[in-house]
Amino acid sequence: MNARTPSSMLLPVKTVKRKKETSPVTPPPVAVAPVLIEDEDLNNYMQLAGMGKLRLDQLMYKCDALQAEKRVIESAHLYRQWIEHTEDPQKYLALFNYGSVLQTLGMTDLAEEAYRLCVASEPKLAQAHINLGLVLERKGQNQQALDQWSNVVAQGVVNPSSDKLMEITALNHIGRVYENQKQYEMAEQALRRSLQMDPKQSGVIQHWVHIRQKACMWPVYQSLPNVSANDMLMSTSPLAMLSLHDDPVIQLLSAHAFVGRTYGFKEEFLSKDKHYKHKRIRLGYLSGDLCTHAVGLLMADFLEAHDKSKFEIYAFDYSPEDGTPYRARLKQAFEHFHPVGSLTDREVAELVLANEIDVLIDMHGLSSGARPGICAMHPAPLQGTYLGFIGTTAMPWLDFVVADRQVLPEELTPYFTEKPLYLDGSFLPLNKNMADITPITRAQVGLPEDAFVMAAFGNVYKINEDLLAAWANILKQAPQAVLWLMDDNEKTTAELKRKLNQIGVAAHQVQFSPRTSYQEYLARLQVADVFLDSYPYNCGSTTHDVLNCNLPMVTLSGKTMVSRMGRSMLSALGLHELIANTFSEYVDITLKIANDAEYQKELVKSVKSSMLRKQKNPKLLTASLEKQVQLLIHKNA
């Protein structure tokens, strides 16, 4: 899950107005396909432009009017006609606006050409460099895009009296692209500079904080000029907050602040007073992760287990078509499968309403790819969230959260805006059908054959100072142990190595391996001796994989839903001895396994037998959800 890119980090494509004259330019023409114009007034403008007799201000006025009427292509033709036949000292302004129109139409090659002519004519027009960079980024030319934005930041390009916003925007784009490239140090520097210029950018603070997490820059919260501690806290994304604070109050406040500034709390009630009386309950799933995504990988058995005699199962899906057999299997699990990726939120909501869905389950919550605008219209009488975001969403249009009493005990419910819908056992589905695994040896991944291997393959941003200190404590007391981590990117790996060395961990006790295919990742789990869960953001789908590989997992359970996922699964399997409540217990449990080979073997047997018992009836969890849905409908009838 990745944090959502806020609108404050993006510069909208826009046109510019005429300003003081500069030297004339005569660029070569940039053309789009011809179009038949059946508008006498527009034809008059085209004729004047073709004769070089249309003033620039008249051109801009008419083109703005055409765009307001959604006649964008005709606007592009008028700009082209004027550019080809008119000499004007401010032709670069028309070129910029022409590029903007072409960019809106998705004609990236032509837009690039127009913008390049523009900046060649007026190198200090910051907006042109910004938009040219966006076009180049869209074409996959990231370094060239960065060069354009760097031009804006460079001294002498920006007009200080009017273009401070342009410099901030350029820095934000630079930070965004570097973040996407996992060049976190460069991204952090760009966004830091942006915040020094304007400290009130909550969306930029959000990204800056999460970048520091992903780069293991500790402390994550570092003081910035004119950014208060509270502003920094409340600007942190809910996803980042899950791994920063094991405090349900802070997580609720963070989610509420994020929803307020990103989506707002405006609701519609399309399904108001709707009480359907279908023979079978119509249960809908709204998701963009019905594929080989972490959430999707949990769902196949669960969805296939629905009782079709009592439930009619719908998908409203905007997942990527990855072409895998698993994706095909997920699609087959639904009685009605509606691809909605090309539809607007309103169109999806109206489709849900038209299908008279009784209960709609949003599989995203506040996770990456969420489309909360759909549920905000209340297209179904009852709506809830499941799996995508392990915490409260603070979205008033979601009535319930699917959970269990271990992961969300009643004492935590005051910190949720949703009511808990409790399932029996663990709320995490257990998909028994694993991918085909080709066994590997330790030598193939650079591990010592005789070492006690402790795998910790959670996302790097889930690592924090306290967790790293606990791992170091284990390594110091178990010299035969090796900590096996994921090599997410070169700089973060180097930083983790430096930190471990600084607290006295020998270099040979730490092994990093790069990301790999899902099949190889499962094979790696099978050559480890134990898995160390992260805290306070416990592993979710990874826990499922670990236990399916019969690998014991030590978890640290906390005070929030996300820090109790490991407890949820291990409790359901009867493996209570692997659940720690403090860092001290976490260390002690792991050391006991590391120093007692017989105990380790018994644990492996316990995990295997517990998983086999659980897998004998994969329909239990689905049946539990169905029972709760039936009770919910009856209660709200």
Placement of each model-derived feature along the sequence:
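Short hydrophobic signal-anchor/transmembrane segments that target glycosyltransferases
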Residues: 302-309, 465-479
